Amino acid sequence: MYFGIGIERCKNIENMGLLWRSAENFGADFIFTVGARYRKQLTDIYNSFQRVPLYNYRDIDDLYEHLPYSCRLIGVENSPGAADLRGYKHLQRAVYLLGAEDHGITKKAASMCHEIIKIPCEAGCFNVSVAAGIIMYDRMLKLSSN
């Protein structure tokens, strides 16, 4: 059982730092970026890079070509038809893809995902690193209870 989590077209370096620290705390096997738009100056006072690797992919095709064998790409997007996280059954082998702070995941990325899930909220949407934390916490709770 393993999972990775990352952000497509991330533009805010702080969100990557928060994702990295949360990923370590929730047991992610790796994190990644797809077409990142920030300057690569990661500051990590907790040295998460020593325990959770970061992969950088040029674009969604590059990520898809490098998905581990028998692993599903799960998009996280508040869009019509997306499965509600509250009833979602996490897969044993999954890579979660979240979208940029300003636009969400691209249409091309959404079309390449095996599934799309959404986090219900009262209004608008969550910050991308907060959404990642919610997904990882939900995964930890549901899979540890099996």
Each predicted region: which residue ranges?
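Gly/Ser/Thr-rich helix-start
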Residues: 18, 76, 100, 105, ...
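Structured adenosyl-cofactor binding patch, chiefly the S-adenosyl-L-methionine
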Residues: 109-146
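Active-site/ligand-binding-proximal alpha/beta "capping" segment
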Residues: 79-118
